[in-house]
Structure formats: C-alpha cells, structure tokens
C-alpha cells in the first residue's frame, strides 16, 4: 500500500515537472514569436535619405526626409522615392504610416509594396483620381478606380490620416483611420503594378501625383501565418 502511494506521488510529481517544462516551452515560443513581430521602422535613423533613393521620373518634385517625416514636393506628374535597404517586408505582414496632403488635387500616398514575393507588387493609392479614390492597383490588370478594392473618400488638406495595411499571400486589407476600406481575397488573382513609371517604385516605394505630401511613422512587422 505504501509503495503504491509512493509510486502515485512519483507520477504526480513527474506530471508537475512535465507540465512545468511544457509551460516554459510555451513561454519561450511566445517570446520568440513576439520578438519576430517587433515593429521595424523604415524611416532613416539619422539625417539624410538613409536607405531611400529619390526617383527620376522627369519633372518630379524634390523629396526630403527630416526627423522621420518624408516630404514629397509636387511635380509635373509622378514624384517619389524607392527603398533600397535590407528590411524589406515579407508576407504575411502589416504596415502602417500617417500621411497628409498639403497641396495638390490627387493622391498623397502611393505606397508600392511586395505582396506574395518581392517581385510581385501592388500600389495602395490614397486620394487618387481627382483626390478621393482609395484602393489597390492592380488586380487582374484593373486599377483601384476599376476593381472592387476602390472606394471614394473625402480627404482634407493638412490633416493627418493613419493608414494600415495587412498583406497576406491570399488577401489584402486596408484601413484609413479606424475604417476598414479593403478586405479582398486574392487567391487565384493576378496581382501587379500599373504599367509605366510606378514600376520604378518597386519593391517598396512612396509616391504622389501632382501633389505635395508629408508621410511619417512608416513601419512594418510580421504577422502570424
């Protein structure tokens, strides 16, 4: 009888030890996952353009980074920058920034970014086609003004708007402020960039069209699979 009690106590103690080890394993895995999901800032850490390069479109406006804020001056048509660094987002991930139009009448945030892989990119447009269209270009060869991601929103000059994107291999989501504007399944869809100068912004770039804008707080982090 005593031996049975001892054996039972041993099993109970072993169960506690195993349970504790499992808990520690879970804690380590959780910490590793949290470390993988840390925000990565894409703004230069010191004065200058950092890992960003001004693009030559012909007639483009000046671009400058200052204290974490990118200013893109109005050009004849397209103006912008491309990222040349190593911290390129890889799906699944989320990316966020704030943007505002200070002058002009067209898009103040043209964010080109990788989706399924670095060679497959789309552009998130905020304030395009006369100042109000929001959406992704291109899906199945159709621009944001033509596909189901497009919607019209009213934007005020000099007002900051928070933009958050969630990029997965088979879906795209977008929020402006607290409002979700895009939630589209892209499985089996053809994703790509509009033909023309916007291709220079790949795989990660920021641009405007005949508009002066300021953009800040640009960062990304991994999402769980």
What are these model-predicted stretches?
Residues 81-87, 149-155, 204-205:
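Beta-strand-rich interaction surfaces with strong enrichment in secreted/lumenal proteins
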Residues 61-80:
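Short carbohydrate-recognition loop motifs
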Residues 25-56:
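Extracellular carbohydrate-recognition regions
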Residues 97, 218-220:
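Extracellular beta-strand elements of beta-rich domains used
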Residues 140-162:
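Short, aromatic/His-centered strand-loop micro-motif at the edge of beta-sheets
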Residues 162-190:
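Carbohydrate-binding surfaces in secreted/extracellular proteins
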Residues 184-214:
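Flexible glycan-contacting loops in extracellular carbohydrate-active proteins
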Residues 77-137:
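Secretory/extracellular carbohydrate-interaction modules
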């Amino acid at each position: 009888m005593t031996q049975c009690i001892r054996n039972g106590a041993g099993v109970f103690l072993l169960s506690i030890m195993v349970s504790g080890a499992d808990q520690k394993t879970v804690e380590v895995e959780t910490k590793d996952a949290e470390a993988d999901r840390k925000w990565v800032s894409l703004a230069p850490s010191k004065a200058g353009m950092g890992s960003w390069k001004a693009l030559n479109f012909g007639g483009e406006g000046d671009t400058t980074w200052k204290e974490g804020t990118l200013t893109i001056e109005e050009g004849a048509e397209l103006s912008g920058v491309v990222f040349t660094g190593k911290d390129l987002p890889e799906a699944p991930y989320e990316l966020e920034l704030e943007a505002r139009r200070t002058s002009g009448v067209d898009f103040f945030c043209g964010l080109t970014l990788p989706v399924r892989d670095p060679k497959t990119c789309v552009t998130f447009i905020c304030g395009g086609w006369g100042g109000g269209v929001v959406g992704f270009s291109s899906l199945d060869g159709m621009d944001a003004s033509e596909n189901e991601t497009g919607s019209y929103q009213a934007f005020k000059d000099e007002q900051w708007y928070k933009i958050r994107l969630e990029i997965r291999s088979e879906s795209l989501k977008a929020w402006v402020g607290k409002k979700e504007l895009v939630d589209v399944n892209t499985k089996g869809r053809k994703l790509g960039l509009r033909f023309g100068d916007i291709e220079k912004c790949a795989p990660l770039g920021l641009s405007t069209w005949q508009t002066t804008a300021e953009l800040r707080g640009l960062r990304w982090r991994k999402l769980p699979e």
